[in-house]
Amino acid sequence: MKVMTQFHERLRAQAETSQLAIRWRGLPARDRLALLWLGAFLLLVVLYLALWRPAERHLQSARQYFTEQRALHAYIQQQAPNVRQADAAAPQAQIDPAALQGMVTASAAQAGLSVERLDNEGEGAVQVALQPAPFAKLLPWLEQLNGQGVQVAEAGLDRQVDGRVSARLSLRVE
């Protein structure tokens, strides 16, 4: 406690002898009061600009995001019966699980894709690694497979140059 008291006394002595303190005491009382009010005003302005406005902007963007997400949720809920109905009505082409490897290889070649590696993962499942190819060719091929009853269980895509991707896919018969 004694150390703190001594430190406080030294600090006060230095503050009283500093140039700024001497100039402050030399000002008329009215000027000191005006400077105190100006300092308080500037402190409020800084607090408003540094804390309040950014928080207000963040709150506004969060409200907008929430509104957009609520609208998206309502749209999804509204469209869910249509999706279920369309899914139930869509005929699924059934393929023989044993013929999956040949079908994947043939359809990939037809789509202009080169199969780098094809591993059998058991009954009705294969793992495919494709050489880099345009993404625009890969997507229609996957849609074609889906239409034939082949589901993409896992997909790993690595972006290459010029819109090309290399893909690692786990495919299985639905």
Swiss-Prot record:
Periplasmic face of the membrane: 53-174
Cellular component annotations (GO), alphabetically ordered: plasma membrane; type II protein secretion system complex
Comment text on domains: Two distinct periplasmic domains, one located in the proximity of the transmembrane domain and the other located towards the C-terminal part of the protein are both involved in the interaction with XcpY.
Function of the molecule: Inner membrane component of the type II secretion system required for the energy-dependent secretion of extracellular factors such as proteases and toxins from the periplasm. Plays a role in the complex assembly and recruits XcpY resulting in a stable complex in the inner membrane. Provides thus a link between the energy-providing XcpR protein in the cytoplasm and the rest of the T2SS machinery.
SUPFAM superfamilies membership: General secretion pathway protein M, EpsM (SSF103054)
Keywords, alphabetical: Cell inner membrane, Cell membrane, Membrane, Protein transport, Transmembrane, Transmembrane helix, Transport
Quaternary structure (record): Type II secretion system is composed of four main components: the outer membrane complex, the inner membrane complex, the cytoplasmic secretion ATPase and the periplasm-spanning pseudopilus. Forms homodimers. Interacts with XcpY/GspL. Interacts with XcpR/GspE and XcpS/GspF.
The protein's name: Type II secretion system protein M
Membrane topology qualifier: Single-pass membrane protein
Annotated GO biological process: protein secretion by the type II secretion system
Consequences of knocking out this gene: Absence of XcpZ results in decreased amount of XcpY in type II secretion system complexes.
Intervals, Cytoplasmic compartment: 1-32
Keyword Transport: yes
InterPro entries on file: T2SS_GspM, T2SS_M_periplasmic_sf
Cellular localisation: Cell inner membrane
